[in-house]
């Protein structure tokens, strides 16, 4: 009989989920979930499940009995959230989160919830702390914040991670802007990038590693800013990538949020991560992380 902690991962085929599968398997007994896309889940103990089906979800808890649940499943693309019926986004991002919290309480499991930096106002200054004003301006961000609230209303055995812009190279259907930028630059295509939108980006595999470290430290109930330590614009991130990967910086085109009037004008949700660092977490610089990504790519 295994004495390893049992970890249930939702969204195992998603952008972060694929890295959590690789990072946590072997160190823990994992069960990773997927729905429409398998991703890399077929390489691990996994199950296809519609997480909005409460009966199936309850059966999964009954059979697997997790010690920790990492809830990474969501309608996580703000643009995708706009294109879907609001009721569907709410069901996945809010109702499912509440159901998971209730099941975690029932089975005495800890819940790690991947929220977003986009819950912050975006106009209150830079390097925001966890108690900064919360003003989500998109349906996606609003439902992620509602997810936080639902969890807190259910129980207090949780860790909420307000996740920054994640970047890296995906091996599944779930891609990201950084990967698209790299491929365009590699092909000699110009890439328009915001000069006036600031985040604290975090590499995907660093995110998975940090979650692993937090689990090992037996985390207590908290809400944490979950990002890198550097505040950069999208354009500056592109410049770092070009510098590390010897790509043509002249292909980077400066654009402003003002150039796209229909785009949510979220100017600055860069986050202060002192609280995260207080766990003894080592955060790599963006240049260090990208250097490792490019090295592995070759």
Task: Place the predicted regions along the sequence by residue.
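SDR active-site strand-loop-helix element
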Residues: 10, 33, 69-73, 111-117, ...
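N-terminal Rossmann NAD(P)H-binding glycine-rich loop of SDR-like oxidoreductase domains
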Residues: 4-26
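Mid/C-terminal beta-alpha module of Rossmann-like enzyme folds, strongest
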Residues: 210, 217-261
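C-terminal amphipathic/interface module of NAD(P)-dependent oxidoreductases
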Residues: 264-298
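Rossmann-fold cofactor-recognition segment
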Residues: 42-53
